[in-house]
């Protein structure tokens, strides 16, 4: 009885979600929802490579080998990122769209809050080698921003990401499809009971 008494109160926290539209494996547009973080480029390549490795290797080896396989498969690409009524064009190797801060225990999008009605994007524009020189700062405390090699963008409505060739998209750790992709904020769709 006492263990569930807090459920009777009115204390809730409203979470936003992301409505993601991208191409599936057959080139058809699909729409799905996610609540935390989406990744395009390096992060997606790493996760897809990790999933292809045999489970008998164990979780640590799969993460380690997945990073290096995904890293090897990643190239810097010409990107067009639309956000609300603005846009950014440039070259990058990794795009993070954040509604929440953490993925797999890593504070990847440190300025994102899931109930603020805003999506944040980080476009990694530096050299691909920045991926492993930045990792200690990211893994320790999310101290990778601000950085001259990371473009920070915010959108109250939506992001769109296009590249000079299709790039893999994952969200909340699950494969979603490929670019072109849009990420629309859907405010306060989940109520978390406190």
Where are these regions (language model features)?
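Catalytic core of DAGKc-family lipid kinases
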Residues: 1-93
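Gly/Ser/Thr-rich active-site loops/lids in small-molecule metabolic enzymes
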Residues: 54-62, 103-105, 111-132
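Short acidic/glycine-rich loop or secondary-structure boundary segments that cap or lie
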Residues: 43-46, 89-91, 103-106, 129-133
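Short beta-strand-to-turn element immediately C-terminal to the catalytic PLP-Schiff-base lysine
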Residues: 20-21, 39, 49, 98, ...
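ATP/nucleoside-binding phosphotransfer catalytic cores, i.e., glycine-rich phosphate-binding loops
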Residues: 83-89, 113, 123-194
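A generic structural signal for short beta-strands and their flanking turns/coil linkers
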Residues: 75-77, 91-93, 115-119, 155-157
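Glycine-rich phosphate/pyrophosphate-binding beta-alpha loops
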Residues: 39, 43, 96-110, 175
């Amino acid at each position: 009885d006492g263990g569930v008494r807090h459920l009777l109160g009115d204390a809730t926290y409203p979470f936003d979600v992301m409505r993601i539209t991208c191409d599936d494996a057959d080139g058809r547009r699909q729409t799905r929802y996610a609540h935390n973080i989406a990744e395009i480029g390096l992060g997606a390549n790493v996760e897809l490579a990790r999933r292809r490795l045999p489970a008998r290797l164990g979780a640590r080896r799969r993460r380690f080998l997945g990073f290096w396989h995904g890293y090897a498969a990643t190239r810097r690409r010409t990107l067009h990122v639309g956000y609300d009524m603005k846009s950014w064009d440039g070259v990058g190797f990794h795009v993070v769209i954040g509604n929440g801060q953490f993925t797999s225990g890593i504070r990847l999008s440190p300025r994102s809050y899931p109930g603020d009605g805003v999506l944040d994007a980080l476009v990694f524009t530096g050299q691909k080698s920045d991926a492993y020189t930045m990792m200690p700062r990211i893994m320790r405390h999310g101290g990778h921003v601000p950085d001259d090699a990371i473009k920070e963008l915010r959108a109250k409505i939506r992001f769109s990401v296009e590249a000079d060739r299709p790039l893999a998209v994952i969200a909340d750790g699950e494969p979603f499809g490929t670019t072109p992709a849009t990420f629309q904020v859907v405010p306060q769709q989940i109520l978390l009971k406190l």
